[in-house]
């Protein structure tokens, strides 16, 4: 029986999908591989199911690099994530595939890029797109190979996946569903002044009298702990635990605020005029959103409270991660359990003149990604580019499962085996069709749908303040660029997708389109003069 491990292939440009790679094999080998596949899975002789490791996947919503293992904020206190990192491997150059919940999570769970599904906005749910309704998701892939699968909290966006699809006798996304993600306790009225864009109910932060046990994430962690404590041992399990915080509204109890006294609070590196060297296109991708601009936060004296609230929520959710880790460590299966922790995207706290996500800079794209468990080196870091897209093939490989030809990620197993091993393919993040950010170890290239671009030397400019392509029409004045800079642009450009699917049917919420006569936000043409910074 043939077993093809996609981890053994070279780092191809991103437009070379697994299917395209497979089609490049000799015909007899390709036909044999496809003939022995089931549900798009390339199968082979498999080890005894019971010997396979358990997987606990912990997802945290809107968590940027403000965690101790990444050092994004000098004050942050995340002892549980620090403990996990000390037990395993932290990818310090990991990036999401979309700076928005639904497309990012869809990409991770299906192994396909937004450009390959047309999922760019908060809708639709992938199963409602006829072309992709039968995609095998990550939990389903494990279920097909003998795993018990459980999902609690926010793994898919909103309530996606929880309802039985038409024609199904049962919900086929996983075996067991836990509680949905929720804010939990809320104050009787908003704690901050009315915000622009309709005073959205989620735009709020601060503390009010309530208990940690009243929060939605506490309930999700309690469910996860109960599942681990009572887990049968007849088969391995794949447990997905998704936490809501630090997504807005950023509410936490007073004890978490006490960790960050206002008088000693370190503010993020916010540079006045930081958007002076970025094109108008950089504004279009977050054109009209409920998240306040930095100017509003400063005028209403809300920037410091937001930063403090975000940090407090990060520390609270870290404590819930700690509860799950404690349950794993006291479990009789602790030595055979792999833990992976990730966030769907980052979050701006005033940097680049905005709060929220929906950008292609480090604040939105860089995410925590930590692996720990059997076969994973302890206390190590890897600065090679990594993508959330890579989790599907990586976890499959670590569990001894065969690959799935639908996936476009590349396994991180070579870097887990050797954290210094070079990885040719950079990380790409997409926000609506045509807008991409591409990162390797040194450079970040951003190209917008109208061809306008930005380039940052992340080695000398880690906060991405200095756009090296300022006032340089893209490739029309190549001679103005240094040789090294031009070569970096050339190298990264080859990873732009050759084709991009248009918006999937039912797409809505935070949708930007480039049409012949300009950019359109939510079907309304953008007028540059309307820019509010």
Model regions and ranges:
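Formylglycine-dependent sulfatase
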Residues: 30, 39-448, 453, 462-494, ...
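Hydrophobic alpha-helical transmembrane segments of integral membrane proteins
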Residues: 22-23, 364
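N-terminal secretory signal peptides that target proteins for export/translocation
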Residues: 1-20
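Bacterial N-terminal signal peptides
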Residues: 23-37
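Short, charged, surface-exposed hinge/linker loops at domain edges
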Residues: 505-520
